[in-house]
């Protein structure tokens, strides 16, 4: 009975710290220092949320740039089902998926002359990635230009405008946020 009081007081102290003080403190600091990120990095147009800068969307029309395939089950880019496909490189099912994706991309992009960029046929580890390389976006220019009656030069400039350099120059590669790029495309039509 003697050891019960210190154990109970330690339990209550840790419960208060880890269940109350720490979550409230991190929430307050996050809202204070990083309000945009703490609230989901939402892209807004007026009062309307158009997407998140961190999660891809399923753009399927010919007038949009397409991102990486989503690995989430049931519905593409579902953040509640985040996770990779977990198919090994040696798995024949992965080969079938990639072959089907390449065939679909070739059919949708008949004017593209080079090989299909790898990130357009392979899902990311989270299954929610919204970034592709500027080269993968440029590969899709003929299809988007034709669907939107825009010039190749206009789309090349738009890709360059929305390309982001890596945080450290020699680590990583430039990327294009597909959600932001496609929203910019929609603004061109207005």
From Swiss-Prot:
Keywords: ATP-binding, Cell inner membrane, Cell membrane, Ion transport, Membrane, Nucleotide-binding, Potassium, Potassium transport, Transmembrane, Transmembrane helix, Transport. Disulfide bonds: none annotated. It holds the Pfam family KdpC. One of its GO terms (cellular component) is plasma membrane. GO terms for molecular function: ATP binding; P-type potassium transmembrane transporter activity. It is found in: Cell inner membrane. InterPro entries: KdpC (IPR003820). The chain crosses the membrane at residues 10-30. It comes from the Bacteria. The keyword Transmembrane applies. Its main location: membrane. It is a single-pass membrane protein. NCBIfam families: kdpC, PRK00315.1. Belongs to the KdpC family. The system is composed of three essential subunits: KdpA, KdpB and KdpC. Part of the high-affinity ATP-driven potassium transport (or Kdp) system, which catalyzes the hydrolysis of ATP coupled with the electrogenic transport of potassium into the cytoplasm. This subunit acts as a catalytic chaperone that increases the ATP-binding affinity of the ATP-hydrolyzing subunit KdpB by the formation of a transient KdpB/KdpC/ATP ternary complex. This is Potassium-transporting ATPase KdpC subunit. The lineage of its organism: Bacteria, Pseudomonadati, Pseudomonadota, Gammaproteobacteria, Enterobacterales. The gene is kdpC.
């Amino acid at each position: 009975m003697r050891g019960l009081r210190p154990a109970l007081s330690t339990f209550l102290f840790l419960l208060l710290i880890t269940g109350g003080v720490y979550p409230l403190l991190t929430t307050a600091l996050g809202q204070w220092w990083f309000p945009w990120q703490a609230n989901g990095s939402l892209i807004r147009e007026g009062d309307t949320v158009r997407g998140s800068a961190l999660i891809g969307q399923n753009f399927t029309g010919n007038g949009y740039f397409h991102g990486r395939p989503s690995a989430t089950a049931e519905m593409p880019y579902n953040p509640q089902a985040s996770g990779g496909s977990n198919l090994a490189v040696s798995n024949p099912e992965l080969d079938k998926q990639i072959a089907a994706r390449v065939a679909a991309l070739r059919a949708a992009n008949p004017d593209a002359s080079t090989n299909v960029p790898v990130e357009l046929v392979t899902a990311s580890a989270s299954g929610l990635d919204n970034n592709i390389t500027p080269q993968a976006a440029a590969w899709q220019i003929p299809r988007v230009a034709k669907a939107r009656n825009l010039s190749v030069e206009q789309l090349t400039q738009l890709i360059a405008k929305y390309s982001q350099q890596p945080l450290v120059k020699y680590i990583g590669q430039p990327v294009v946020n597909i959600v932001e790029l496609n929203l910019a495309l929609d603004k061109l039509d207005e």
